Amino acid sequence: MSAIAWELPEDVRAVRDGLLDFARKEILPRHETHRDLFEDPRRLYREDGRFSDALKALIDDVRRVSAKAGYYNMCVPESLGGGGLGHLAYYVGWEALFRLCGPQNWLMLYVISHWAFGPSRLLEKVTEEARERMLAPMMLGEASMCFGLSEPGAGSDAAALATKARPDGNGWRLTGRKIWTSNA
């Protein structure tokens, strides 16, 4: 059985190489500088389960510096003001970061915008008013989103979710319960 001879397109290789250089210069040193934070899980989280103030500040810093370098929003659709690079660049970028940083250095998770907590195609579905209010700070890495899917008794089974959103004349009324909200 023969292998498929295929090479990454030059533009994707250039993005990958630039991203790796960025991570070596900006992300790995931040992780090393804050090693004490990562070596003790009690320093990562507050008693209520949220990120500690120190970790939150570090994540915010990584997001901002990555946005300034053009990597944070490189795969966000052009219609939302992003770089418009496709899925191939997105996944090649993630793979490169995981290979370089490994699972122990998860600050790299905040280098490229993630659909659940950064500017993404989800913003194509919100009102123009909401997009105008939220998009610019997200593209600059100054704000992020959160994502709440999991519910008691349903977990992440979208078909079993009980939370409802109903128009109430002034907007929407949400009823239900969520657990494990990502990036809250």
Where do the protein language model's features map onto the residues?
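Short, conserved phosphate-binding/catalytic loop or strand-edge motifs used
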Residues: 111-118
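Short, solvent-exposed polar/charged micro-motifs at secondary-structure junctions
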Residues: 43-45, 85, 118, 156-159
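Amphipathic, small/basic residue-rich leader segments at the start of a protein or domain
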Residues: 1-111, 129-133, 137
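Short, well-ordered beta-strand elements within core beta-sheets of diverse protein domains
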Residues: 5-7, 119-126
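Glycine-rich, Trp-frequent "lid" loop and neighboring beta-strands that shape
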Residues: 82-83, 122-184
